[in-house]
Amino acid sequence: MSNDSIHWEARYLPAGPPRLLGWNVPAEELIHIPEHWLVYPEPNPSLHYLLALLYILFTFLALLGNGLVIWIFCAAKSLRTPSNMFVVNLAICDFFMMIKTPIFIYNSFNTGFALGNLGCQIFAVIGSLTGIGAAITNAAIAYDRYSTIARPLDGKLSRGQVILFIVLIWTYTIPWALMPVMGVWGRFVPEGFLTSCSFDYLTDTNEIRIFVATIFTFSYCIPMILIIYYYSQIVSHVVNHEKALREQAKKMNVDSLRSNANTSSQSAEIRIAKAAITICFLYVLSWTPYGVMSMIGAFGNKALLTPGVTMIPACTCKAVACLDPYVYAISHPKYRLELQKRLPWLELQEKPISDSTSTTTETVNTPPASS
C-alpha cells in the first residue's frame, strides 16, 4: 500500500470509523512517515493533551534541576574539581535534552505532525546528541568513581585528562546525530503518535537493520557494560575494604579502626554502594525500553509496536533527565552546602563537612553518580 493511497483512505473514511494516524498530514510530508504508523487509528485527543502536560512537567523539573547544577558547579570554586566537570557535562546533556520538548508539546496540542519534517529533524538531532552524550558521560563518571576509589593515591583524573575525556565523549557522540540527518546512514522519522521523532527502526531494509544494530551496540550496550562493570568493581572494593578493616581491628583487639570523624560520616562506603545501585537501576530503567523497542522494530514482530506502546520509552528517557540532577548532585553534601549558601530560603540545613574527614570519605563525597 503506497503512502498516497493510505493518505487518501485516511481522509475519506466514511463517518463513524475512526480516522487513521496521519490524516491531517500534508501529502508532501507523508513520505517521511513509516507506513507502519499510518494503519493505526488516530488516538483520542485527550491522550495528546495528557502527554503534552506531562512533558511540560518534565521540562520544568529538568530545566530547574539541571540549571541549578550547572549554575552551582560553575559558580562555586570548591566544586570546580576535575571529577565535577563530568557532572556538569551530564547536566548540560539533560538540560538540552529538554530544550527540544516544545516541539513535542506543540505537536501534541495540534494532535499530530504539526511542525513537519523540519521540526522532526531538529527534535531527533538534539535527542541523539544529548541521549548518547549522557550515556557515554555516565560511563565516564563510572570510570572516574572506580579509579578514584580503587586507587585513591594515584587514580584521580587531572583537569587535562577530564577535558580530553569530554572531547572524546562528544567526538564519539556527534557522528550518530549527523549521519542520519545528512542521509549518510540511517534516517530520522516520526514515531508513535507522530509527535516525537527518533532514528528509523521500522523500514525493512538491510541498511536500516545494520544501522539499528550498530547504534544499539555503541550507544546502549557499551555504556551499559562499562557502567555495570565499574560500579560492580566499586561495590567489590568497598566490601573487601570493610572486611579487611574488621579483620585488622579484630587482630588489634579494638572495635573499629575508624576515627571519630570517620564514624560520624556514617559509613561513606555504604553510600557509594547505594549510589552505584541507584545509577545502574536508573540507566537500565530509562534506556532499556527504548533499546528493546528499536531491536523489536528492526528484527522482531513489528505488530507489538503500537503507537501507544512506543510513547512509553520516550517518556522514560525524559524522566531520567529530571532525576539525574537529584541523584548526581543534590544528594552531594558540598553541593547542598553551596546551594544553601546561595538560596538560604530553601532551608536545606546541611551541616558543614569536617576537614578531618577521611580520605575515603572525601573520595565518596565527589558527586554521587546516575538513563
From Swiss-Prot:
It is found in: Membrane. It is a multi-pass membrane protein. InterPro entries: GPCR_opsins (IPR050125), GPCR_Rhodpsn (IPR000276), GPCR_Rhodpsn_7TM (IPR017452), Opsin (IPR001760), Retinal_BS (IPR027430). The chain crosses the membrane at residues 53-73, 85-105, 122-142, 162-182, 210-230, 279-299, 303-323. PROSITE patterns: G_PROTEIN_RECEP_F1_1 (PS00237), G_PROTEIN_RECEP_F1_2 (PS50262), OPSIN (PS00238). Keywords: Chromophore, Disulfide bond, G-protein coupled receptor, Glycoprotein, Membrane, Phosphoprotein, Photoreceptor protein, Receptor, Retinal protein, Sensory transduction, Transducer, Transmembrane, Transmembrane helix, Vision. GO terms for biological process: phototransduction; visual perception. It comes from the Eukaryota. Disulfide bonds join C120-C197. This is Opsin, ultraviolet-sensitive. It comes from Apis mellifera. The lineage of its organism: Eukaryota, Metazoa, Ecdysozoa, Arthropoda, Hexapoda. The gene is UVOP.
